[in-house]
Amino acid sequence: MLLTTTLSLTAAAAVINFWLAIRCGQVRASQKISIGTGGNDLLERRMRAQLNFVENTPWVLLLIAGIELAGKGGAWLAPVGATYMIGRVAHGLGMDGTALEKGRSIGTVTTMLTQLGLAVVAVLVATGRM
């Protein structure tokens, strides 16, 4: 069984993670910081954005894969995953603390709602109620 939605979203996650890493690397290079944050607030914010992404994204992808494997994905699953990914980009930008700071809140809420919603669906699928 080809998990088209899961594969597409995993590819998107890899690109976003790469982008978040590049953003950290840009600050490291410009400030000549090799290890740690060097007390640089922007680097700390960007590192937290990437770490937050890698803390949450595996759960979302596992839930999506499980739902898709169970044959319960349907047309709704890809847009939910895409919304999550957009929220994570907004969070990454918002973590810089600039005019885009609202993106952090948007990304946080999107992440929480996506995880909770997918977890509920997974339980419904697992118990045969969906």
Please tell me what each predicted stretch does.
Residues V60-L61, I67-G97:
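Mid-chain, well-packed structural core segment of small domains
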Residues A90-G117:
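Interfacial loop-to-transmembrane junctions
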Residues L3-W19, E68:
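Alpha-helical transmembrane segments
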Residues L9-A12, V80-T83, G107-T110, T114:
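Physicochemical signature of membrane-embedded alpha-helices that form the seven-helix bundle of GPCRs
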Residues N52-I64, Q115-L116:
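Core segments of transmembrane alpha-helices
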Residues V120-M130:
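Juxtamembrane boundary at the C-terminal end of a transmembrane helix
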Residues I22-R48:
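Cytosolic, membrane-interface loops and tails of multi-pass inner-membrane proteins
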